[in-house]
């Protein structure tokens, strides 16, 4: 099992290229099921979760072709063509779905186009309870018959789904994506109230419009979808990853470095940039993306509360906790989105971080210096927060179970090493 070795204490300086957003790509890929024509996606990140989704779609009968030349050593220049002309299987099996919760996003498209779907209940990072009940209740409102049997969601509908007024009792990103896709082929108008407003949902909606969907209110909390009889193919480029952007912004800050993030969308970074600015980091837009500098002055603790977009993202909480562990003074970090999302805390305390958890809040008191240690990744964002802490720590840190990291970050050690980080991947105890 791979591990990562880091010797901390070097300020990072240079440029890092930001890839396409994992969470956008994982919703865009199943959208291919809504048409028999080809959906061509560019700027796809090369990640384990993307491969898992590709394997799931292939199991349904989607044919795929990867064209174009790779740019920047990654898959930035590649175009993935997905064609769902001959779908022979509407079952999403447990062995694939258990690896990643986003697999449930095939449910809406399969049901809308084929009138049936059998999808295993989802897996992914073990962070609290992520109920798919909200997806299922909304599909029932649209006329679907839903049963749970042997760990599978069995959904069917006579004829087409019917437009409905769906009001989500709480904001759900996956639920909004599933119902948005299903509604494009439903009969009549669907209104999705209390819809999630994440940029990845805007990206999905704009791709669906490019495929012939009729959607109003994109980017707002109320989406109106006028169903059409069929969608067609399209070419679409995945939005840059705001979480990857934020993570490398914190890498610059925590090492007191200076990094330009090429390809970053500055307009999607408002909540993260506000927090970074408040704690003393200099953030500015550049013609190529954004620049983050923390090589002058000190970092001070600030309070953070995670919220649905446009609030501070839950997927940046662990990274900011690492930064606050090195800041002057105290900060309070409150997690309102997911339960059980402080699994990185015991590992950070092994490195000398001073963190006390009280329910859904963590009090972080900045430590004079973190020190290297053997630590273990428990989930995707926790794993990268340990890498960030290690970059700032004195001495050597070994991060174990980095397969979590590969689910969400493309070539992380390569990108950091290019900015001066002393970092290497170890395979079975030896350097690659």
UniProtKB/Swiss-Prot annotation:
InterPro entries named among the record's database cross-references: Enolpyruvate_Tfrase_dom, Enolpyruvate_Tfrase_sf, MurA_subfamily, RNA3'P_cycl/enolpyr_Trfase_a/b, UDP_GlcNAc_COvinyl_MurA
Entry-annotated residues carrying 2-(S-cysteinyl)pyruvic acid O-phosphothioketal: 125
Keyword terms: Cell cycle, Cell division, Cell shape, Cell wall biogenesis/degradation, Cytoplasm, Peptidoglycan synthesis, Pyruvate, Transferase
Amino-acid positions noted as binding UDP-N-acetyl-alpha-D-glucosamine in the UniProt annotation, renumbered to this chain: 101, 130-134, 315, 337
Catalytic reaction list: phosphoenolpyruvate + UDP-N-acetyl-alpha-D-glucosamine = UDP-N-acetyl-3-O-(1-carboxyvinyl)-alpha-D-glucosamine + phosphate
Compartment(s) of residence: Cytoplasm
GO molecular function: UDP-N-acetylglucosamine 1-carboxyvinyltransferase activity
Superkingdom to which the source organism belongs: Bacteria
SUPFAM superfamilies on file: EPT/RTPC-like
Residues reported in the UniProt entry to bind phosphoenolpyruvate: 22-23
EC number of the protein: 2.5.1.7
GO cellular component, as recorded: cytoplasm
GO BP, sorted A to Z: cell division; cell wall organization; peptidoglycan biosynthetic process; regulation of cell shape; UDP-N-acetylgalactosamine biosynthetic process
CDD domains: UdpNAET
Active-site residues, Swiss-Prot/TrEMBL: 125
Pathway stated in the Swiss-Prot or TrEMBL entry: Cell wall biogenesis; peptidoglycan biosynthesis
Protein family according to the UniProt entry: Belongs to the EPSP synthase family. MurA subfamily.
Described purpose of this protein according to its UniProt entry: Cell wall formation. Adds enolpyruvyl to UDP-N-acetylglucosamine.
Name of this protein: UDP-N-acetylglucosamine 1-carboxyvinyltransferase
Organism: Paramagnetospirillum magneticum (strain ATCC 700264 / AMB-1)
Gene: murA
